[in-house]
Every structure is written in structure tokens, then in C-alpha cells.
Amino acid sequence: MTDSGSAVRDSVLSTIGTIAQGASRFAYTVIVGRLLGADVLAATNTAFAVSILLSLLGPTAAGNAAAAFGGTGQTGRLTTKALTITMVWLSAILGAVALVTAHLLGGGGASSLMVAALTVSWSWYIFGRGVRFGMRQVPAVAVWDNVTGALSLVLLVAVILTHMTPLVLAPAVIGYGAFALASLVGARRAARRHDSEERPAPTQALAHFLIWSSLGLIATNGIMQVSMVFAAVFDSPARAGLFAAALSLATPLSMLAQAVTPALLPQFAQWSQLPHADRARSIRRATLTLTVLLGAGAAVVIAVLPWALPIVFGQDFAGAVPLAQGLMVAVFGFSLSVFLSAYLAAIGRARISTLATGTSALVGLMIMIGASIGLGGAVGAVIGTGSAMILSASLLAAISLWPGRKESVR
């Protein structure tokens, strides 16, 4: 199979797996909202937001690095080993930060511990996906996404039926943890089959990638997660619950770019070696394709939301419809930004990408604060996030097609 054909196959399989995991996450929130109410849904989605936000401080970038630079080759295996060691202490630190953050947001001891556990589990899940992608084990990712997604839903139903509401996050913790464990075990087995004399991993290039990729991910993804926390802090629990339902419906589309991007990182690395004209043609074609797919998906979702949302969550959540429709604009820009940021990082232009996304995030945050003063935290979160993501996607698209000097990684 050609490199392009392999990339397409990997993208399709990656998307299938992430759709399965995204569907299980969506079903998770629907079950919580339907059976436990808006207040518990708001708390649950806020916990997910905190976990994902903290994972942007290294684990997500480590997963991307494992996908881009890992593999079964000698240097790739050593790179994965170095990243795994980094993840051990990094996840411990982020778990402690999550514990404190959850407490500051009003969580009790048990709920704060669950948020910390979710942060650690999610961080290893994201890293495990990257390890699998780096070793070209994309079919395994799809299989385990399906298995662990189903496992988390079964456990969630069991938790609710046994009236153990304080443990509502435990099924997600177990599901993500099981995926991560399977990924690391699979990677270890693959490494044993390719034993050879070790040599130092490219630590300078790896550190550069981790730092700038993390900054770029925070700037790009952070505003989406901050919006949930913002709505929970600056609006009533009921309104925050409506925003949580809206965000739950908007999230699956955003996962498309997140699913495709890791599988394309090796292809991005190859594009970085091409002449500018060829590279620009490749990214232009890929960006146009993704834009059409995302635009069509967003339009369909916006059209069906007025009747679909009340059916899914119940009539009590009908007020979330305009919030969800507004968030679809944000998700459209977010998905393009994730894709383009990963491309720019892979070709050595992470700094200018981070500057663009960071500026967009700051502008969006200011708009979010201003709009919330008169319209409330939930509406302010929608307006601010949408503004940030559209500005980010526009700037990144312009940068991606602009002749630029490749940044040094030394």
C-alpha cells in the first residue's frame, strides 16, 4: 500500500475508533443528564473539562510526540520509553493539581479525588493512543476504543442503579485506564520483538516539540475546556447544566479532527521535507477537504438540534438548543485549528502557530468575560469561544499557506 493510501486507511480507522469513544462519552453525558439531572451533569462535564484542560500541560503533546517520533525502530522505541518515563511524574503532578482545582471549585473530598483520578486516567489514555499510532497499530486503537467505551457505559449504569452517585466518574476512569494499560502492554511487546543495541534518543528535538506543542494545544484546546468551567462558575447550576448538555452535543463533531490528526502526523513529517509548493498544495487539499466535511456536519447538526436535543436530554433541556447551535460555530473553528496547529508543529512552525492561537484565545476570553456581564456565564462562554475559534482557524489557515522559514529544533 502507498504512503498516501496507508495514511487514508489509518485516518479512517482512527476516526472509527474515536467515533466509538466519542459516542460512548456522549451516551455517558446523556445517561447522567437523563437520570441524575442538570446539576450532576454540570458537575460531571466540569470534571471532564478540568481533566482535559490539565492534560494539555504535557500529556497530549507527549501523545502527539509518540505518534510523530515513536515507532518500532530503534530511535522510535527509545523516544517512546523516554516519553513514558516523563508521563509517570507528569501525570502524578497533574493529578495533584486536579485535586486542588476540584476542591477550589467547590467539590467535596470524594468528588475531588475522582477528578484527580480522571485527570490521570485521561492523560494516560491520550498518551496511549499516541504510542499506538506511532507504532502503526491503528486497528488496535479502533478495537480498544470500542471495547473500553462500552465498558465505561456498562459500569456507569451499574453505578446509577446501585445509587452510588459520588462514583459517577469512576466508569470513565476505569475505561480510559484500561485503554492506556492495553496500549502500553502492546507497545512493550512490540519493543521486545525488535530488540537492538540502544542509542540516545533525540532529546533536544523532543523537548522542543513537547514545549511548543503543549503551548499550542493549550492555546487551541484550552478555551473550549475553559468555557465549561466558566459557565459553571459564573452562572447558576441549572444554566451550567444547559451549557453542559449543549457542549455534549457539540463535542462529537470536534472529535473528527482530533481523530484524524494523530494518524496524519507521520504524513505531516513527510510533507515537511517537500518543496514549499508541493507542501502547500498538500495542506491546501487536506484543509479544503476537512473544511467541507466539518461545514456540512455543522450545518446538519444546527438544523436538527431544535428537535433532537429535547429528545435526547428531555424537555427540561430545551433551553440548551440556542447554546448548542452557537457552540457548533466554535467547534467548526476548533476542529480546523487542531488540524492546522498539528501540521504547523510538524513542519517546524510551532512558534508562530502558538502565537496565533494564543492571541485568539486571549481575545476570546476577553469577549467571554464582557459578554457574560449582561448575558450570563453560559451565553458569554458560547460567544467568547466561537469568536476565539473562528479567529484562530483563520490565522492558522493563512500561516499554513504562507511561505515561512522552518524553525530550528536545536
Model regions: which residues?
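Helix-loop interface residues and adjacent transmembrane-helix termini in multi-pass membrane transporters
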Residues: 35-38, 135, 161-163, 234-237, ...
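Helix-loop junctions and terminal segments of transmembrane helices
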Residues: 30, 58-74, 246, 250-274, ...
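Membrane-interface junctions at transmembrane-helix termini in multi-pass inner-membrane proteins
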Residues: 72, 121-144, 329-358
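Signature of the first transmembrane helix
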Residues: 5-60, 211-237, 365, 385, ...
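Transmembrane helical elements of multi-pass membrane transporters/channels
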Residues: 10-25, 148-152, 168-190, 199-266, ...
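Membrane-water interface segments that mark the loop-to-transmembrane alpha-helix transition
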Residues: 9-25, 47-106, 276-300
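Interfacial segments at transmembrane-helix termini and the short loops linking adjacent helices
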Residues: 38-42, 102-118, 303-332
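Hydrophobic alpha-helical transmembrane segments
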Residues: 113-116, 142-192, 359-363, 377-402
